[in-house]
Amino acid sequence: MSITFNKKQQQVINELNQNILLSAGAGTGKTNVLSYRVANILNKNRANADEILCLTFTNKACRELKNRITSQLDFETANKITIRTIHGFAYQVITTTAKKAQTIFKEFVIFDDEDQKTLIRQTIANFPKARALDIQYIVNCIEQLKQERALKHIYTEDIEADYTTIYHQHLKFNKTFNQQQNDNLTKFFQFDGLNIIINYELALQQMHGLDYKDLIANAYRLFQDENICSSWRKRYKCIMIDEMQDTSSFEYTMLEKLFPANNIMLCGDEFQTIYEWRGSNPQKILTAFTKKYNPLIINFNENYRSTKLLLETPAS
């Protein structure tokens, strides 16, 4: 069955020179368009299959995109394209690099969200004050501290010393700018937060575990090595990242290391973020991307799913 695309959809499929910023909600045909764009990149010889990187935030979106792309191509070609979630890609970066470097964690266990919460509950059992805190609040604070550690490059073999350094920096900042009233970490530290993060990290280390924030943080750390980063940047000529509305600023910072000299397309629905609590700030990311990479901005405003639902609704 042939598919008819509207003008804006055709523009996304055919524009292979400029970077693109696509705003497209559910039902606008975005995933189909992305799969046809990948096929067009290959047909026009703009990149080989193994030089295309497609990333999503959720597993569901990743599976759907992979299925659509596979339906456009033969299996062997489709299988060469890197189609991952952002965390899956970070995992790939870590494990691939670990094979080449003796200093990097070679074998580790991934702690998903539920594993993480279980370990946190076990950790706070030793700190009575912390039991009054909501578990998701503790998760958020731990992830914020991990992110600060990565961004500030505070990495030694002494976990306790590293987080104590961050703690004292935080106290100094609050004292200087009088920020403690509105700061989540201040409250966390008042409820034994420093001991919680240290003991949580030590427990993870003992079990050779990495949580999802660790995947991003360690990929970010690896990309600080220009040789490693350049190697990954040269792998891909075309990069498409979907679900940007749910991508955190830290994840974007890690991925942006791959952008220079490549063709980049970001897509998402900036009005439908459901992960704001984990650092998702679509407008901040879109503004930064627009300013630095001067993309063609396209908005899919025709919702085919809504039209179909209206047509299928029986008359009253």
Which residues does each predicted region cover?
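Accessory N-terminal region flanking or inserted into the helicase ATPase core
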Residues: 1-23, 28, 32-33, 51-53, ...
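P-loop NTPase Walker
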Residues: 1-103, 230, 312-315
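Short, well-ordered alpha-helices that flank and scaffold nucleotide-derived cofactor binding pockets
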Residues: 36-44, 67, 71, 217, ...
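Helical mechanochemical/support elements of P-loop NTPase systems and associated helical scaffolds
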Residues: 61, 65, 116, 134, ...
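N-terminal helical cap/lid subdomain that shapes the substrate entry/recognition surface
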Residues: 88-89, 142, 295-296
